[in-house]
C-alpha cells in the first residue's frame, strides 16, 4: 500500500507542487528537507509575478512561517539533494503538564492531576493524535514552556507538539510551577510559541487571559501559534474537565466551543460570575471574520494556519454557567 509521495530534489532550483487540502506555513510544508532548503518562491497568477521569497529561518516579510497554498507551484532552492516526503496519513502530537502540590507556596489544586490526565488519556484514544508526554508536580517545569532565547527548552518539550495543555495556578502575567527549574513562574515575556511546532495551547489557570492585559502580554508569544485558551477571571479545576474537553474536540467542536462548553459545565460556582477566554490569531486584519477562532484540532474539522506575526488578535470570553 502506498502511504505517501516522495519527490527527490536536487541541489539548486526545483519546482514543487503543494499537495495538501489546507494551507500550511513553509516551515511545516518543507520540514522533511531540514536545513537543505534555502529559499521558496511562489508565483501569483493574478499579478503574473513572483511573490516575495520565503527564507529558511527568515523573519518579517521573508519569514518561513508565511503560508503556502494548495494548487500552486513553488520554486525551492536547495543546498544539497534530499527527498521531500509527504505522508497520506498524518498523526499529530500533544502533551500535558499539571501542578497540584506547590509545597506550601500556593494553595494545593486537588484535582489538577485528574483534569490533565483525563485530557491526555482521552485524546490519546484518537487515531490522529499521539501523546508525547505528561508531567505532574515537580516533573512539570517552567523550562518546558520557556523559549530557548530566554534560557528555556520549549523546543524539546511543549513546542515540539501541536497541542499543549496545562493545569495549575496562574495570574495575568503567566503561570506557576512547584519547582524552581528554572523558575517557579513562566512569565509572558519568556514565551515564544509556534516557532517550532505548537499550534494550540490551553492554560487551565486563573486570570491568565485577563481582558485588560492578555493581548499586550501574550500577543508577542504568537510565533506560529493559533490560539490560547484560558480564563479571564479566577477559574477552577474539576476531575471531569479534561476528558470532557478532549471528547468534545474529537466530536468535531471547535477548540473554543469545546473549551467554553467544558468550563460552562464544570467551573463552579457555575453562576456566570467566572469567565473562560480565548486569544486567537487574526490573519486578514478583519476582526469580523473568525479565522483561528474557528479552528478545530487536526483530523476533526478545518483550521487556519496563521503567519508568525499575526496582523491582530481576536479575543472572546464566556460566562461559566451551565444551562440545561
Where are these regions (language model features)?
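Alpha-helical scaffolding within the catalytic cores
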Residues: 148-153, 180-192, 211-219
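Active-site-proximal C-terminal subdomain of hydrolase catalytic domains
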Residues: 208-324
Amino acid at each position: 500500500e502506498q502511504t505517501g509521495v516522495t519527490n527527490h530534489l536536487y541541489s539548486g532550483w526545483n519546482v514543487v507542487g503543494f499537495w495538501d487540502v489546507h494551507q500550511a506555513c513553509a516551515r511545516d510544508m518543507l520540514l522533511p528537507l531540514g536545513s537543505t532548503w534555502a529559499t521558496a518562491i511562489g508565483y501569483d497568477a493574478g499579478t503574473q509575478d513572483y511573490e516575495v521569497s520565503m527564507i529558511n529561518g527568515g523573519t518579517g516579510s521573508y519569514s518561513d512561517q508565511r503560508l503556502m497554498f494548495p494548487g500552486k507551484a513553488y520554486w525551492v532552492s536547495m543546498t544539497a539533494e534530499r527527498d521531500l516526503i509527504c505522508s497520506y496519513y498524518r498523526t499529530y502530537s500533544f502533551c500535558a503538564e499539571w501542578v497540584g502540590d506547590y509545597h506550601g507556596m500556593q494553595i494545593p489544586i486537588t484535582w489538577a492531576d485528574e483534569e490533565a490526565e483525563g485530557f491526555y488519556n482521552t485524546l490519546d484514544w484518537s487515531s490522529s493524535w499521539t501523546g508525547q508526554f505528561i508531567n505532574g508536580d515537580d516533573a512539570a517545569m517552567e523550562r518546558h514552556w520557556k523559549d530557548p532565547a530566554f534560557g528555556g527548552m520549549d523546543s524539546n518539550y511543549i513546542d515540539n507538539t501541536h497541542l499543549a495543555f496545562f493545569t495549575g495556578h496562574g495570574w495575568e502575567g503567566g503561570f506557576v510551577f512547584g519547582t524552581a527549574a528554572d523558575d517557579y513562574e513562566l512569565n509572558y515575556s519568556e514565551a515564544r510559541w509556534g516557532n517550532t511546532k505548537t499550534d494550540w495551547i490551553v492554560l487551565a489557570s486563573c486570570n491568565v487571559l485577563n481582558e485588560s492585559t492578555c493581548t499586550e502580554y501574550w500577543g508577542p508569544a504568537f510565533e506560529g501559534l493559533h490560539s490560547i485558551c484560558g480564563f479571564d477571571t479566577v477559574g477552577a479545576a474539576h476531575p471531569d474537565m479534561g476528558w470532557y474537553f478532549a471528547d468534545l474536540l474529537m466530536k468535531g467542536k471547535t477548540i473554543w466551543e469545546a473549551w467554553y462548553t467544558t468550563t460552562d459545565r464544570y467551573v463552579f460556582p457555575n453562576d456566570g460570575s467566572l469567565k473562560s477566554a480565548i486569544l486567537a490569531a487574526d490573519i486578514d486584519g478583519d476582526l469580523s471574520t473568525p479565522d483561528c477562532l474557528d479552528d478545530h484540532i487536526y483530523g476533526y474539522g478545518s483550521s487556519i494556519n496563521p503567519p508568525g506575526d499575526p496582523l491582530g488578535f481576536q479575543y472572546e470570553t464566556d460566562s461559566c454557567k451551565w444551562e440545561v
